[in-house]
Amino acid sequence: MPTTSTRKSTLQYLGLTLFAVSLLIFTAMLGLDDYKFSEENILDPFRAGDQDTIYWQQDAAAFHQAHLKIAGEETGLFTETFSTTFASEKKLKDTYGIAQARVKKHYETEGLPQAVDDQGDPKMKEDGTAELVQMWQVELPDWKLKNNKAFWISEAATGPVKSRPWLFFLLTFGLAALGGLLYILPKFGAKPGIKNDHIYHNPLTRGLDLSWRSVFLTLTVVGILVYGFYYMDDKLFWPAVTTAISLIIVGLVLFVHNSWGRDARDAGPEDYSGWLGILAGTYFIAFYVLLYWASQHIVAWVHMVDPISKGIFEYFSGREKDPGYSQWFLYGLMYCTIMVVMGVRMIARYRHNKYQIIRTISVMFFQLSFAFMIPEILLALNKGWYGNEATLPFQDMKNIWPLDYDFFYSWSIDGFINNPGSLGVFMLFWGIILVIVGVPLMVHLVGKRWYCSWVCGCGGLAETMGDPWRQLSDKSLRAWKFERYIIHGVLIFAILMTAATIYSFLPNDDYWLNRTSFLVIFSVLLAGAMAVALVAYRKSRLTISKLGLLLGVAFGVGMIGLNVFYMTTGGDNYLFANTGSVQKWYGFLIGAGFAGVVGTGFYPLMGNRVWCRFGCPLAAYLGLVQKFQSRFRITTNGSQCISCGNCSTYCEMGIDVRAYAQKGQDIVRSSCVGCGVCAAVCPRGVLRLENSSEDIYDRAETERVIHISEEGGVSLMN
């Protein structure tokens, strides 16, 4: 009876052992340190600042400190030692709640202070009585607890991780990288390419059957939405809208498109469920939940990489790094380490294909340089942080709107234009030119692969760490229908959120670029897009259902009508909602929940390009250009196809490549990222990645012939 396991060398078993040990240590680190709070660290954020020049602001700061100190003494916050971050957080919340109640009771008993104007003179009401400040201006705000608790817990830590960060860095990052390389390097001695070595039997890579996959996906999505209602506090408009739209999409796909009751392709053989894959996916999901929404519980991991972060900062800045807490250096360093180690694996596996080698090196380079080191260097060169001194912009220079969704936020624009040099203005115009000119031009020339498979960090992680799970992408028609609605829905959400952001940022005065002129430009662009779509549809160049076309036109007309309403009324909040709440919800749902928790956590459950396929708004934008105005296509030589199915199996975007190859039809799909793995795994050389401007509008035709004449030369004819 044939075995379902692959033979591994002693060196590879050693590598697996080292990796498992490093993962155990990495997880156990979170419980090794103790936590003891100091009065100074707790009270420091509540000291009166230079901007607190009004007497009642200084008095409020003093009251806050006094009542926090009393509450801390009552609860034992400053005397007890806590063994976990959870116990520390609970005590902090209890203490803060008591202090809030005491402060509120004080002002209710003693009365609120009198308000003053900009000159410091007391404000008076029309009836001659004194105008008082409002309670929210003097009470202890919830946001200060939320913003400071991770820093407080970090500063309270004492123990082996805090005192020996380098040791734990070597025992985790070092051992994991060494173990991974010991497992990967022997692959250079084996035959390159895929071996079809029981990928649907391996408990790590065989995926889940449809029922289990649906359960995991439903629980995760519902969990994120439920937490979103809590996360948004009392601003429930956008969570409610998202829930309603989600139900509409499900109804459209299952009932309007008659997908209910139809078979959908399982990721693996029937009744199989990869238990190691489930564990890996659960671990990834838990990591991203902690990273985005509960970073106070990963202070040990942050302490471990602090020496590296401080070393980079002090080397380039020439000054000592201010105390603070951020989990993002940890994430960036992990991201780069994983991409490098798994990038070596990618090169070992596809070393027979030069395209794959160059592509893998490219994404590693852009991640290490443009996404990690250059931003860290710019951060070190900052001279101020929302203060009087200007700050250098330090974001990822290769990120493009709408993937970089906060590019047009007011704090981002201020950071660009308020610098004394030209770097900020350059980066602002660079970002705008990339969106308007760079993206369409590059996609026209070579397809969306130039970004998704050669530059993007999200795609880079998917291609390296996610490569073992690329075969789990759902190739069913139902999945494709969900894909089209969801990814273009996210793109529309990004456009609306950005429009609201720009509208709120612009002045409402006589400048040439004000709110009214912006709405006019936005309306003209919408009308132009609808006109192009309708013309293309009439000429049969736009393959879209009538329902899809009607939905698109209805959206465009509705937005133009909304713009006219705001041009005539001049409201402050575009989309009838506070701009801050729109930004907060988009960052939570798309930036964290979709891109992180689902996008990466579901690698072992739904394949490595879940985010790129279903959620990335930039991929949707690139895909629209690729579908209708790109020279790129994957050509097929149908006569050579033996229907082995390798191409479809290893397509990470869920495209049934074999169906195209069997018909001899070139592959022109908006979702295709041009990774080229389908061509790399084809044993007959049926598939080729090519560019040509000869037949842009006829690339996807099923039947074409070559017409040769003296007058017209060589041309493709239907």
Language-model segments: which ranges?
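Non-ligating segments of multi-cofactor redox enzymes
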Residues: 1-665, 670, 677-680, 684-718
